[in-house]
Amino acid sequence: MARKLMVALAVVVTASVAVLQGQGKRAAGPSVDVFKSATCGCCAKWVDHMRNAGFAVHVSDLEEPELQKIKGRYGVPASARSCHTAPVEGFTVEGHVPASEEKRLLKEKPAVVGIAVPGMPLGSPGMEVSGVKPHPYNVLTFDKQGATTVYSVQKP
């Protein structure tokens, strides 16, 4: 009886350690501060996408005038703006950028201010709609002068 109890206890402890280690790895990714509107459901879905990709995400809900000031402060050109802004490791991420493209940005470290998915294209992370065909969209880089360049074409 004591042996069965010890085996069961060992299984529980091992499983608990594995779960805790997995949580630690998930939160150990790059830290992202997301500035968004409290009423934007698609932004909340994008935050979930980022967390699921291993990013440590902190969210600040702002009123629209403050959100626009943040976009200006982080150098997002008007032509590249979307619904949320997220500084990460010295870069600015604007809109529904896939986590894979953010990881690429952090690995390559191009000489840009940031990357953006202008607008809210269907099929981008957080903008998935059941029964609606996703649209191809561009991920853009932007520089200090506000010039944009296609970084990648997404075909969900």
Feature roles, as predicted:
Residues 44-84, 88-89:
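N-terminal, post-signal-peptide region of Sec/Tat-exported proteins
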Residues 16-27:
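Bacterial Sec-dependent signal peptides at the C-terminal "C-region" and cleavage site
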Residues 26-53:
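Local sequence-structure signature of Cys/Sec-based thiol-disulfide redox active-site neighborhoods
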Residues 29, 33-37, 59, 65-69, ...:
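Mature soluble domains of exported/periplasmic/lumenal proteins and thiol-rich metal-chelating peptides
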Residues 72-156:
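Thiol/selenol-based redox catalytic cores and closely related redox-interacting motifs
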Residues 8-16:
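Bacterial N-terminal signal peptides
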Residues 39, 46, 63-66, 98-102:
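Stable alpha-helical elements in mature extracytoplasmic
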Residues 1-4:
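Positively charged n-region of N-terminal signal peptides that target proteins for export
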